[in-house]
Amino acid sequence: VSFIAAQPKLGVADSKNEEVYRGKTPKYVFMYIGDGMSYAQVSSAEMYLGEKAMPGKVTPQQLNFTQFPVHGALMTQDSTSFIPDSASTATSLASGYKTLSGVINMDETKTKEYQPITEELKEDGYKVGIITSVPITHATPAAYYAKVPNRNSYYEIGKQLAASGFDYFGGGDFDQKTGPEGTDQHIYEIVEAAGYTIADTKEEILALNDASGKAVAIDPDDYETALDYEIDRDADELSLADYVKKGIEVLDNKDGFFMMVEGGKIDWANHANDAAASIHDTIAFDDAVKPALDFYRQHPNDTLIIVTADHECGGMTLGYSLTGYSTNFKKLQPVKMSYQEFDKIIQAYKDKKPAQPKLEDLSQDIFNAYGLDLGILTSYESTLLKNA
């Protein structure tokens, strides 16, 4: 799935036929990647919003990026499988080559490195920004500044971030801050020694601007080094859109910029088959496109916005025969939290070590979180829930 909002295109070669587009090169480029987002995720978000706005009507509410003038579709298989991972697919998006699952910007032999487009643009004088709602060293953001044979080499990826010289990193934190064994130099020290300012409070992040120099903005409310799921985010917490707005400020310059923005929590929600969390993060991803659209309206002849995805995740479907193809989006509207937040409630209950634990003890918590009344369940449904 791919959506393009402006006519100027990058003058880069296709890795297969080497044909080069020689039209106007955009000055400002926004590259959005919805991790794990395919047509089902996009459609479910639009249908959810439509049902919420007009209950009972079959009228989806279009997202910002589905209204773009150019649409396309992609085949996402990599050199390993028809079901690829984020490392190989991000490599394809960043450098133009397919590779093995788990590999970032290297070939199938893991000996030849590929140059991501960000390095080429930096050489041409562009400023570069990388934003994500998951750890900044995870596969998708890493493909825009790192080259490693194993996507799990988070510490090495972090060191390559520091060495990249790119101008703005925003969103999630670093994994393996002191290396895989916890015995290496703290990654923050390496990043700061490379000339970066680390902003890890809301006040510090909001104070960043085009005079701040190279900056890494780390979400102060992160959980597992990532932004909260959108459904769990408090109103005063920074959103993915906030990091995009700040990125535009930091990267502002006369020579142009490239910004990659990943909606990574879409993928995480899909891995857990959490439909409500997936929908809310897809909407948050779309909200993050709006600052780019606002910027585009100010610079319509110099701006390129691409919204795409790396692969589907979770096998989301919108209905099937056993439910009579009902979509039931209104049943998702009472959902107030992600599976991750509800896991904390379950763990707190377990920590109390009840003598005879019962599902009914959590009935009020379940109702508050999901709008589900255990009292209306059939015996069969109740058994399914208990076994789950």
Located regions from the model:
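Generic low-complexity segments that are intrinsically disordered, proline-rich and/or Lys/Arg-biased
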Residues: 8-9, 61
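Sec-dependent N-terminal signal peptides of Gram-positive bacterial secreted proteins and lipoproteins
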Residues: 1-5
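A post-motif C-terminal structural segment
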Residues: 26-28, 37-91, 138-388
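Mobile, glycine-rich extracellular loop/lid and propeptide segments
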Residues: 10-45, 93-143, 160-161, 264, ...
